Amino acid sequence: MPTLLPAELELWQSVESEIKKILSSYAYQEIRTPLLERTELFQRTIGEQTDVVSKEMYSFLDRKDQSLSLRPEATAGVIRAGIEHGLFYNQTQKFWSMGPMYRYERPQKGRYRQFHQVNMEAFGYEGPGIDAELIIMTSRIWKNLDIDAIQLELNSLGTSKSRKNYRATLVEYFKDHIDSLDEDSLLRLEKNPMRILDSKNQEMSALIDSAPKMNDHLDQESRDHFNDLLERLDSHGINYRLNQRLVRGLDYYTGPVSYTHLRAHETPEHRGRRRLLEKKKGGGGGGGGGGGG
């Protein structure tokens, strides 16, 4: 977990200031949530079978034997706060937050167990306009920070119904090739089969490339939504690459998902729509999108 020294903080503060100006220009408001939340919040919203919850969270029991966890991401806490304070009922909201997150991962270049993230969330908005806004806004951030060696990848996970149908098709496909799956993929097969598509095992690359494609299982609503998003990005000159193997490791993603990385190797930003999350927490307010980096 890194320490930020005075000389480094000057650069950090400059970057943060530039980001805040752009977020403010799009009418996003700051929200601050606790570093600690009840573990069950992340289990319900992120998904108990995800790698984040099952392997990567820092969790402990307090003096009342209540399980608490350091936040591994920001969205769950923002949703909880919005529902508890009635911020989503019959209204739209745009929030941003900034701060440290924690995951017990293997430390490596560019990846730390404490990492800092900027999070943008929009609630109560329907249609692809809000997805386009988040991507265009993020593109402005990269441009203003003089970061241009980046690659934006896009995919659509569709509605919760189309995702469920695709999941069943995927399980059937991989069961027919079960002898070719590695240990991690065998564990994911029943619990989170879409994560197999994200495997870095080169020996499984051909098998994954031949797997059923999500695009072939999208309903018409999802197809229209995604195509509209692409047209909006094209009109704003946003470059992207379609990646049908792109999935997110958290259960609450539906609709368009994106993954932005430096062409070298790092991953500064990812985003996706989170319709399922409010349902799991019991809140209303329609669709929404969000991103963090």
Regions found by a protein language model. Name each.
Residues 1-263, 280-282, 293:
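TRNA-recognition modules of translation machinery and tRNA-sensing kinases, especially anticodon-binding
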